Curated annotation (Swiss-Prot):
Entries under HAMAP family matching the protein: UPF0178 (MF_00489)
Lineage: Bacteria, Bacillati, Bacillota, Clostridia, Natranaerobiales
Similarity-based family: Belongs to the UPF0178 family.
Protein name per its UniProtKB record: UPF0178 protein Nther_1836
Pfam hit, one: DUF188
Length: 147
């Protein structure tokens, strides 16, 4: 088991590093050239700038039972097909049951934006989101290590 982090605009990298170190879990952070990330714990992979370059590296390095951290619904969908556990930084899991609805909602919002319309904006991040994420990540690691 390892944790793969989609580092582009990931607000929970420090939490991931802390929890992974606590439970001795390998972390792979994938970023593009426009982001600078230093970690004395995680392996940092830099992808070329380009649409989906980070996503492709993550998917190609994901194995069954790995944990993938992302806000990207498309990447989440691909990681689920590799039988990974996929977490959103707000502390909830992407699942086979919710991914289709999330992708459909994303598509509808894109269509509204293309017509210069408005759509519901994502609420601002709260400290509760960090706590939810940290607790969920710990819970999943404990489950995976005990099975």
């Amino acid at each position: 088991m390892k944790i793969l982090v989609d580092a582009d605009s990931c607000p929970v990298k420090d939490i991931v590093f802390q929890v992974a170190r606590e439970y001795s879990v390998k972390v792979v952070v994938v970023k593009d050239l426009s982001h600078e990330i230093d970690s004395n714990y995680a392996e940092v992979i830099t992808a070329d700038q380009g649409r989906d370059s980070v996503d492709l590296i993550i998917v190609n390095n994901t194995d069954k039972g790995d944990i993938v951290i992302t806000q990207d619904y498309g990447l989440a969908s691909l990681a689920l097909t590799k039988q990974a556990i996929v977490l959103h930084p707000n502390g909830w899991k992407f699942t086979e049951e919710n991914i289709d609805g999330l992708l459909l909602n994303r598509h509808i919002n894109q269509q509204i934006r293309q017509r210069n319309g408005r759509h519901t904006k994502t609420p601002k991040r709260k400290s509760k989101d960090d706590n939810n994420f940290k607790n969920l990540l710990k819970e999943i690691i404990v489950q995976m290590k005990s099975s």
